[in-house]
C-alpha cells in the first residue's frame, strides 16, 4: 500500500512515539490540545515533557486544531489513531461525531475501563458512534521510550473489521515494529486493563523484597485472574497467553519503565498514593481502573484476590505488607 495519511490524536508518550514511527513512512499529523506543547514540538521535534531525549522525524507535523487533524484522517487512504487515556476517549469520539468528521478507519491505544460506567473502550466507542464499523484496538507489550528509540516491538490489532486490520498493518508494520492481527477485541482490552493492576501488585512485592519466587507466583496467579474475568466477559482463553495478555503482563510487571510497577514500588516504600501520582507526571492506568476491575469481577462473582489486595492498598488504607499477609493466609485450593 502506498503512503497513507495518518492523524494521531494525543501527544503523550505513547502517541508521540507511534507518531514518530508512522512519520517515517506516512504523511502523519500529531494533535494535542495544549498550544504550548505543540509549539515546543514544532520548534524542537522533541516531546520534552513526555518523551524527553527522543528525536522525532522532521516530516512529522503538529496540530492543535482538532478539526484540521480530523480532516487529515478523512482522506481515502487514511487512518485515525486515538492515543488519549481511557478518561478522554468518550469526549474525543463525541467531538468527532458532533463535528461530523468521523474517519472511516479508527484505532485506539488506551488500556483500562471507563471509571464511571465500567465500560471497555470498544463499548464507549460504540455508544458514541453506533454506526461505525471499521475500528479496533492496537495493544501489546510496549514501552513508549523503546518504540521511540526504534527498538523491536510486536503489537496486535484486534478488530471485527478486516478493513481496519489491513489498514492498521499497512500503517504500522515496518522497521522494527511487527503487527499481528486478531478479532478478539474483548480479550485484548481486558488483558490491557487487568495487567496494569497486576503490575502494581508485583511492584509492591518487589518493593517489599519478597523475592523472585513471589514475583513469579503473582504473575502466574494474576494471569489466572485476568483470564477468568476476560473469558466471562466474552474474550477467548488463548488471547490471554498471547502478546496482549501474558506478554503485556510480563513487561509491565517486571520492566522498570512501567508506571504501574513504579506505583507499587513506591507504595511499598511507604509513600502515599497522592504523593506518588503527583510526582509521576504521567497517567498510571492501573490506579484509575483497579476499582472498576474489582467491581466488574464482583458483579460476575469472579474471584480476583490479587486485584482485591491492590484495591485495599490503594483505596482502603491497608498497608502493603498486611495486604500480602492476607493473600498468604488464604486457604489452599486446586490450581
Curated annotation (Swiss-Prot):
Subcellular location: Cytoplasm
GO annotations of cellular component type: cytosol
PROSITE patterns xref list: NAD_G3PDH
Catalytic residue positions: 195 (proton acceptor)
UniProt KW keywords: Cytoplasm, Lipid biosynthesis, Lipid metabolism, NAD, NADP, Nucleotide-binding, Oxidoreductase, Phospholipid biosynthesis, Phospholipid metabolism
Catalysis: reaction(s): sn-glycerol 3-phosphate + NAD(+) = dihydroxyacetone phosphate + NADH + H(+); sn-glycerol 3-phosphate + NADP(+) = dihydroxyacetone phosphate + NADPH + H(+)
One GO MF term attached to the UniProt entry: glycerol-3-phosphate dehydrogenase [NAD(P)+] activity
UniProt: sn-glycerol 3-phosphate binding residues: 111, 140, 142, 195, 248, 258-260
KW Nucleotide-binding (keyword) present: yes
EC number of this enzyme: 1.1.1.94
Leading EC class: oxidoreductase
SUPFAM superfamilies on file: 6-phosphogluconate dehydrogenase C-terminal domain-like, NAD(P)-binding Rossmann-fold domains
InterPro entries: 6-PGluconate_DH-like_C_sf, 6PGD_dom2, G3P_DH_NAD-dep, G3P_DH_NAD-dep_C, G3P_DH_NAD-dep_N, NAD(P)-bd_dom_sf
Amino-acid positions noted as binding NADPH in the UniProt annotation, renumbered to this chain: 14, 33, 111, 144, 259, 283, 285
Disulfide-linked positions: none
Pathway note: Membrane lipid metabolism; glycerophospholipid metabolism
Pfam families, sorted: NAD_Gly3P_dh_C, NAD_Gly3P_dh_N
GO biological process, one term: carbohydrate metabolic process
Job description of the protein: Catalyzes the reduction of the glycolytic intermediate dihydroxyacetone phosphate (DHAP) to sn-glycerol 3-phosphate (G3P), the key precursor for phospholipid synthesis.
Annotated HAMAP family: NAD_Glyc3P_dehydrog
PANTHER family reported in the protein's UniProt record: GLYCEROL-3-PHOSPHATE DEHYDROGENASE, GLYCEROL-3-PHOSPHATE DEHYDROGENASE [NAD(+)] 2, CHLOROPLASTIC
Similarity field: Belongs to the NAD-dependent glycerol-3-phosphate dehydrogenase family.
Stated name of the protein: Glycerol-3-phosphate dehydrogenase [NAD(P)+]
Amino acid at each position: 500500500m502506498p503512503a497513507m495519511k495518518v492523524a494521531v490524536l494525543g501527544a503523550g508518550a505513547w502517541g508521540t512515539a507511534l507518531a514518530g514511527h508512522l512519520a517515517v513512512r506516512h504523511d502523519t499529523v500529531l494533535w494535542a490540545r495544549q498550544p504550548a506543547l505543540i509549539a515546543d514540538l514544532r520548534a524542537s521535534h522533541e516531546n520534552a515533557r513526555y518523551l524527553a531525549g527522543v528525536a522525532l522525524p522532521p516530516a512529522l507535523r503538529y496540530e492543535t486544531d482538532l478539526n484540521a487533524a480530523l480532516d487529515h484522517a478523512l482522506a481515502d487512504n487514511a487512518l485515525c489513531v486515538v492515543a488519549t487515556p481511557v478518561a478522554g476517549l468518550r469526549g474525543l469520539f463525541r467531538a468527532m461525531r458532533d463535528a461530523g468528521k468521523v474517519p472511516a478507519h479508527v484505532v485506539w491505544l488506551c488500556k483500562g475501563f471507563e471509571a464511571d460506567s465500567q465500560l471497555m473502550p470498544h463499548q464507549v466507542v460504540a455508544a458514541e458512534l453506533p454506526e461505525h464499523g471499521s475500528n479496533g484496538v492496537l495493544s501489546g507489550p510496549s514501552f513508549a521510550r523503546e518504540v521511540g528509540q526504534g527498538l523491536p516491538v510486536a503489537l496486535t490489532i484486534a478488530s471485527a473489521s478486516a478493513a481496519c486490520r489491513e489498514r492498521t498493518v499497512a500503517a504500522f508494520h515496518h522497521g522494527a515494529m511487527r503487527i499481528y492481527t486478531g478479532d478478539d477485541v474483548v480479550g485484548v482490552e481486558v488483558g490491557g486493563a487487568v495487567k496494569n493492576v497486576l503490575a502494581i501488585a508485583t511492584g509492591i512485592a518487589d518493593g517489599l523484597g519478597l523475592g523472585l519466587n513471589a514475583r513469579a507466583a503473582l504473575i502466574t496467579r494474576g494471569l489466572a485472574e485476568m483470564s477468568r474475568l476476560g473469558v466471562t466477559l466474552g474474550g477467548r482463553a488463548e488471547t490471554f497467553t498471547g502478546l496482549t495478555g501474558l506478554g503485556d503482563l510480563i513487561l509491565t510487571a517486571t520492566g522498570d519503565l512501567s508506571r504501574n510497577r513504579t506505583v507499587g514500588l513506591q507504595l511499598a516504600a511507604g509513600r502515599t498514593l497522592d504523593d506518588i501520582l503527583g510526582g509521576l507526571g504521567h497517567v498510571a492506568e492501573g490506579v484509575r481502573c483497579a476499582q472498576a476491575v474489582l467491581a466488574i469481577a464482583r458483579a460476575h462473582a469472579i474471584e480476583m484476590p490479587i486485584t482485591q489486595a491492590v484495591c485495599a492498598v490503594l483505596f482502603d488504607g491497608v498497608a502493603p505488607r498486611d495486604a500480602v499477609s492476607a493473600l498468604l493466609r488464604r486457604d489452599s485450593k486446586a490450581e
